[in-house]
């Protein structure tokens, strides 16, 4: 009777629903593993699960007054994590057919993300052979019974959902010692819990996700700031978004690809969301690619209109672009301010109250945004991402990293790059963090000063940028920073060392590609390993394809919710080329993406990048990584610029060429370093060419197409 009354009360107050695979509770041996977000979790499961389970509760909690009060109504067993006999007792209960609920995190989350996973539950599952049913609780964290006050906008009676995921098992890991088996089983359970979170992500468009964040964290919560030093709340950002969307629809049509040539600024964020909510697809253009690069993007994406700013073009010394690229209609934001009418203002005011009514009908799987590859190995390609793929990558990042509304991001990486867009804009907005948008990562003195001045806690950058920030920064500039993540290029040992020595900060290395929105793997405090780029993100499948001549590692191919919709190529304008990859049998598999990177994956799932397939040279039948050649030069001259290329050779098929800005580098010195590092002499180039500077792309990466031509033609210069 008491159960029925409480169930009716909870259902009335919290509108509790239970969904998913609800017939998963008939297994003979069963362990239920929910996430832990509030003090209500146990009561919710006891009231709404179709079975009467035993709750494994840590001894520190069983002695509290409310647990003593609940004892007559709920079965629970005290679990002492320091006592091995407690685990054996649980195993016996499971083997006797009692369904057991264990909260693997062991404590209520204080970040909104998964906390540390204790391996006890996993070891019980592996030892007993029980089915593991993950459960995802959504909603209790918003109540006053959670521990996220000040992180989320708490309320008295939020809607609560109980999602039941498909049952799985944890096989006993193969390891010589019991301790190692426990750890491996715990990692398996952590993977299951992360997958459960990814499986219950709502399918939304970018604009819907922004509105959800506003609801979650509060409409007046400050969220975004730029060099104007005027911080906007979610409400103010929404107002700007609606204003831009209203004006954009005058000279564009639904479904049109709209070019955007804009800096890192709040108005750019408003333009992206504004175009998206009215069914337009923003194409973020690389303003460092020059007229030729813009023309390639215009052809590939079939652009008719480019939105930009006169002030930006003047400050960036880009005023020549509209004159040289005259095949599109250039629209200037400054010219649009005076065109806002009273009708427009009333439309904006109405939709501030009812923002979802401003949206045109869209699907989460539909095209949301176009980015462009760097063009380091040919013409830039348009990469079309859906709303779902972009938001999936944000959720993957949120699943493994504990970003909260207490964090402040410094975002100086250009928004036209996937790294800057997803990590520097979408992730902070969707996690309730505040973000400072700065227009250039090249201001090595200014960026550290702003990190200090704005109390930033999260900084992302390339190895080159981070190294230069460290050289110019005061030792106290990064005192509040807790996450520094390097990506887009290999993290130099010198950069890693200076951050450790000068600031006491460990740089976490990650790996991504534009086609994956972009983050593929990342080291985080909970799971980090030196000389790797971290584990592949939850929700993604990875496979390695053998490459003839390369003994260590394989060609990385990926499938997952964050994979692009497809390419737009200059050779086939406006036609979407869907992703596919050749499997080990030589057959094309749809929805797989071939990264072209040679990687290794260890037994714990950590990924190490060995090089790109296209950046290997075949010398007398042996495959040599051009990146390994560059690392030899970097060891000799950390401050210099170095890049390796291959040229045709009548004797060996191909020969190595090293381009360097350091005239002190010789073959003899390279051979000495190679021997010290166990690198074969075959990887030491005979052709060493000193240049004033390497040819670079707008992104700062070496232009390997030009370097390849220079390698073939000794007379050619930058």
Curated annotation (Swiss-Prot):
Q: Where is this region: AMP-binding?
A: 233-646
Which keywords appear in this protein's UniProt record, sorted alphabetically? Acyltransferase, ATP-binding, Cell inner membrane, Cell membrane, Ligase, Membrane, Multifunctional enzyme, Nucleotide-binding, Transferase, Transmembrane, Transmembrane helix
Where is this gene product found?
Answer: Cell inner membrane
Map out region (Acyltransferase) in residue numbers.
15-138
Query: Which stretch is the leader sequence?
Result: none
Q: Known catalysed reaction(s)? A: a 2-acyl-sn-glycero-3-phosphoethanolamine + a fatty acyl-[ACP] = a 1,2-diacyl-sn-glycero-3-phosphoethanolamine + holo-[ACP]; a long-chain fatty acid + holo-[ACP] + ATP = a long-chain fatty acyl-[ACP] + AMP + diphosphate
What are the transmembrane regions?
258-277, 409-433
Kindly give the InterPro entries that the UniProt entry links to this protein.
Answer: Aas, AMP-bd_C, AMP-bd_C_sf, AMP-binding_CS, AMP-dep_synth/lig_dom, ANL_N_sf, Plipid/glycerol_acylTrfase
Residues forming the catalytic site: 36
A GO molecular-function annotation: ATP binding
Similarity annotation: In the N-terminal section; belongs to the 2-acyl-GPE acetyltransferase family. In the C-terminal section; belongs to the ATP-dependent AMP-binding enzyme family.
In UniProt terms, what function does this protein have? Plays a role in lysophospholipid acylation. Transfers fatty acids to the 1-position via an enzyme-bound acyl-ACP intermediate in the presence of ATP and magnesium. Its physiological function is to regenerate phosphatidylethanolamine from 2-acyl-glycero-3-phosphoethanolamine (2-acyl-GPE) formed by transacylation reactions or degradation by phospholipase A1.
For this entry, the protein name equals: Bifunctional protein Aas
Organism field: Yersinia pestis
User: What high-level taxonomic lineage is stated for the organism?
Assistant: Bacteria, Pseudomonadati, Pseudomonadota, Gammaproteobacteria, Enterobacterales
Q: Which gene encodes it?
A: aas
């Amino acid at each position: 009777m008491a159960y029925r009354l409480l169930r009716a009360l909870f259902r009335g107050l919290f509108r509790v629903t239970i969904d998913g695979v609800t017939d998963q509770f008939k297994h003979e041996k069963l362990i239920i593993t929910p996430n832990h977000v509030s003090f209500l979790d146990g009561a919710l499961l006891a009231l709404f699960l179709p079975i009467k389970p035993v709750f494994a509760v840590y001894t520190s909690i069983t002695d509290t007054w409310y647990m003593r009060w609940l004892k007559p109504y709920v079965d629970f067993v005290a679990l002492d994590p320091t006592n091995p006999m407690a685990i054996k007792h649980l195993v016996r209960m499971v083997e006797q057919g009692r369904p057991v609920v264990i909260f693997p995190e062991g404590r209520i989350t204080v970040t909104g993300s998964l906390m540390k996973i204790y391996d006890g539950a996993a070891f019980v599952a592996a030892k007993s052979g029980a089915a593991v049913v993950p459960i995802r609780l959504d909603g209790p964290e918003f109540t006053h019974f959670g521990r996220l006050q000040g992180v989320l906008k708490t309320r008295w009676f939020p809607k609560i959902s109980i999602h039941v995921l498909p049952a799985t098992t944890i096989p006993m890991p193969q390891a010589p010692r019991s301790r190692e088996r426990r750890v491996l089983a715990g990692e398996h359970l952590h993977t299951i819990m992360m997958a459960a979170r990814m499986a219950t992500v709502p399918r939304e468009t970018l604009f819907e996700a922004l509105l959800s964040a506003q609801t979650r964290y509060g409409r007046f919560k400050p969220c975004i700031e730029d060099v104007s030093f005027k911080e906007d709340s979610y409400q103010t950002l929404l107002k700007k978004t609606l204003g831009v969307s209203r004006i954009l629809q005058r000279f564009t049509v639904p479904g049109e690809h709209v070019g955007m040539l804009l800096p890192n600024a709040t108005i750019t964020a408003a333009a992206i969301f504004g175009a998206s909510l009215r069914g337009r697809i923003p194409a973020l253009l690389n303003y460092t690619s020059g007229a030729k690069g813009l023309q390639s993007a215009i052809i590939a994406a079939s652009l008719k209109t480019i939105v930009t700013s006169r002030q930006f073009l003047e400050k960036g010394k880009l005023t020549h672009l509209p004159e040289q690229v005259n095949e599109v209609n250039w629209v200037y934001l400054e010219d649009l301010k005076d065109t806002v009418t009273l009708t427009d203002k009333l439309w904006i005011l109405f939709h501030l109250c009812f923002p979802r009514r401003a949206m045109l009908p869209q699907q989460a799987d539909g095209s949301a945004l176009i980015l462009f590859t760097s063009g380091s190995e040919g013409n830039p390609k348009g990469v079309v991402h859906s709303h779902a793929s972009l938001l999936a990558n944000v959720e993957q990042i949120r699943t493994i990293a504990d970003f909260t509304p207490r964090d402040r991001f410094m975002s100086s990486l250009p928004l036209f790059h996937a790294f800057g867009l997803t990590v520097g804009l979408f992730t902070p907005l969707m996690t309730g963090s505040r973000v400072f948008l700065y227009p250039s990562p090249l201001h090595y003195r200014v960026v550290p000063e702003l990190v200090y001045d704005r109390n930033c806690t999260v900084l992302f950058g390339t190895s080159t940028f981070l190294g230069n920030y460290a050289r110019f920064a005061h030792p106290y500039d990064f005192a509040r920073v807790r996450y520094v993540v390097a990506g887009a290029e290999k993290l130099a040992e010198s950069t890693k060392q200076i951050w450790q020595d000068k600031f006491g900060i460990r740089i976490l290395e990650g790996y991504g590609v534009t086609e994956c929105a972009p983050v593929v793997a990342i080291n985080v405090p909970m799971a980090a390993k030196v000389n790797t780029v971290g584990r592949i993100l939850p929700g993604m499948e990875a496979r390695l394809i053998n490459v003839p001549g390369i003994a260590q590692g394989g060609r990385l191919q990926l499938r997952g919710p964050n994979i692009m919709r497809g390419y737009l190529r200059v050779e086939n304008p406006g036609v979407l080329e869907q992703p596919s990859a050749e499997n080990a049998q030589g057959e094309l598999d749809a929805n797989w993406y071939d990264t072209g990177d040679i990687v290794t994956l260890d037994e714990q799932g950590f990924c190490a990048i060995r090089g790109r397939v296209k950046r290997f040279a075949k010398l007398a039948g042996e495959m040599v990584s051009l990146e390994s050649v560059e690392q030899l030069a970097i060891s000799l001259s950390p401050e210099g610029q170095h890049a390796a290329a291959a040229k045709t050779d009548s004797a060996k098929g191909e020969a190595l060429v090293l381009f360097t800005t350091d005239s002190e580098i010789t073959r003899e010195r390279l051979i000495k370093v190679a021997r010290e590092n166990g690198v074969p002499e075959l990887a030491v180039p005979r052709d060493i060419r000193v240049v004033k500077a390497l040819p670079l792309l707008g992104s700062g990466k070496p232009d390997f197409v030009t370097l390849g031509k220079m390698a073939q033609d000794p007379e050619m210069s930058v």
